[in-house]
Amino acid sequence: MRTLLITGPGGTGRTTVAAATALTAARQGTRTLVLGTDRDDTLGAALGVRTGPAPTSVEPGLTAWRPDAAQGFRDALAALQDRAASALDLLGAARLDPQELTPLPGADDLALLRALREAALAEAHDLLVVDLPPAPRALALLAAPEELRRALRRLLPPERQAARALRPVLGRLAGVPMPTEALYEAAARWDLELAAAESVLADRNTVVRLVAEPGPAGADAVRTTTLGLALRGLRTDLLVANRVLPEDTPADSWLSGPLAQQRKTLEEWRGAYDVRAVAHLGHDPRGTDDLAALAVPGVNPDASPVEWPVTDRLAEDGVLVWHIPLPGAVREELDLVRRGDELAVAAGPFRRTVPLPSALRRCTVDGAALRDGTLAVRFAPDPELWPRGR
């Protein structure tokens, strides 16, 4: 199954483009599911049908689904209380009525990750189009599975679970209670769910498509978003320049100024991205006829994979070089920190800690340089760890 994640700056029509992309694919014979994320039914408004917690058939080959984050939160709370029933009874605590609660901050994102996993693992469709939130929130959402799994491993290392029988003894010796079996079981469940979502994002059939309105603000947002996606190793296929004004706009029209800005930005974008322009219809698209009139680009089956290759230059320079693509990065906004077998990379407002390839774990960082949008990190072999004879 192919997965197309669509995001961009807020207010640039990403939901409309997601709906139109799904419609185009369905009419080309691809069984398509479009997944909405807004609490307001903006996806349904674009498609001309109401969407909600139950999948809705828009037309043959196209289904729309907008998960209910609030209901998912209530269901999760009920399940948690069921598992902790004995502890609650022991404490004399009254159970919370799920209907009286509203979702906590972040519940929407967790619900979307769960829905993304469920939809991608199902076999009912060939293409999943996801209308992600605006770019800043989308980047945090896409980073969540990896970051949360890393935090779980640090807080509750799996290898410590082997000492189940020793926990009561260790607790008495330390004078503090040790983590209970239930805590480790909950962590294992969370890790399993997060791993499934992470595998969908890392799959070779998953790509991100950016939508932006050409102009100064759009250009800045695209540059920042592209950098954030690159640091996460996520593939992008196209940049959709949305709401492009007609070229035959009269010179004395008030639209001539915005058109000039769009032309300038489009020229810059075409030098850096695979850009597809989508015309402004003169009104907000509503319904499948309007979506078809947009003539959005179809799904690109040949998006290039993201690679972070290691180059062996031991014979020439005595180093191994790790190449990390970071388009749009600025040298003054880069930072690297080596921590054991991991490398923390900061680029602009983004940060990621990545495990080192096995060969580089036996090396020390020897420097780094940013050239043509690629960060080249040099590693020198550690004589105490590097095999003799190399």
From Swiss-Prot:
Q: Which InterPro entries match?
A: Anion-transp_ATPase-like_dom, ArsA_HSP20-like, ATPase_ArsA/GET3, HSP20-like_chaperone, P-loop_NTPase
Q: What Gene Ontology molecular-function terms does this entry list?
A: ATP binding; ATP hydrolysis activity
Q: Which Gene3D superfamilies match?
A: 2.60.40.790, P-loop containing nucleotide triphosphate hydrolases
Superkingdom to which the source organism belongs: Bacteria
What family is this? Belongs to the arsA ATPase family.
The protein's name in its UniProt record: Uncharacterized protein SCO2128
This protein's species is: Streptomyces coelicolor (strain ATCC BAA-471 / A3(2) / M145)
